[in-house]
A protein has these predicted regions:
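C-terminal motif of bacterial Sec signal peptides marking the signal peptidase cleavage site
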Residues: 18-21
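Lipid interaction determinants
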Residues: 23-157
């Protein structure tokens, strides 16, 4: 009887670790499909592999630039599409992500409702180059290119 109890106890602990072992950060739909993400800034010098962004430097610090960036939003949908707003226009496209390596990709061309220039063009180019993601559904989303020495950061609007 004691052996049977031990067996079920061990089985329960093992199954619990599998069921509760899913990390919220790895749930791509919970992260991406969690509402409207607003662009905060672009950063350089941060350590992508850690959560310590003490050395990350923002690309823009002037109030006018930050206001322009804040007009850029993106909404990821669980059907693999996204839509968003630019400063004076909108855009749409397709995306995919893989939680096993936190890879991210824009699939095909991003279609914009306006001729791209300035910060709008900069954002679309950086979005097209994004290859990795990290974040959570409550606080922030970061997208980085292959080198992961720069990233763009979003927060919920």
């Amino acid at each position: 009887m004691k052996t049977l109890k031990y067996f079920f106890y061990t089985l329960f602990i093992t199954l619990s670790s599998f069921l509760y072992g899913c990390n919220q950060e790895d749930d791509i739909y919970e992260i991406f499909d969690s509402g409207v993400w607003q662009l905060v800034n672009y950063y350089t010098g941060g350590d992508w592999e850690s959560n310590n962004d003490r050395y990350a430097r923002p690309a823009y610090t002037e109030a006018q630039d930050l206001e322009s960036l804040s007009k850029i939003t993106i909404t990821f949908k669980n059907d693999g599409t996204f839509t968003g707003t630019l400063d004076g226009g909108t855009f749409e496209g397709k995306w995919q992500a893989d939680p096993s390596d936190r890879s991210f990709a824009v699939i095909g061309e991003i279609k914009a409702s306006i001729k791209l220039s300035g910060k709008n063009a900069e954002f679309i180019k950086k979005l097209e180059l994004a290859s990795y993601y990290k974040g959570d559904s409550k606080r922030l989303l970061q997208l980085a290119p292959d080198a992961r020495t720069t990233y763009m950061q979003f927060t919920h609007k």
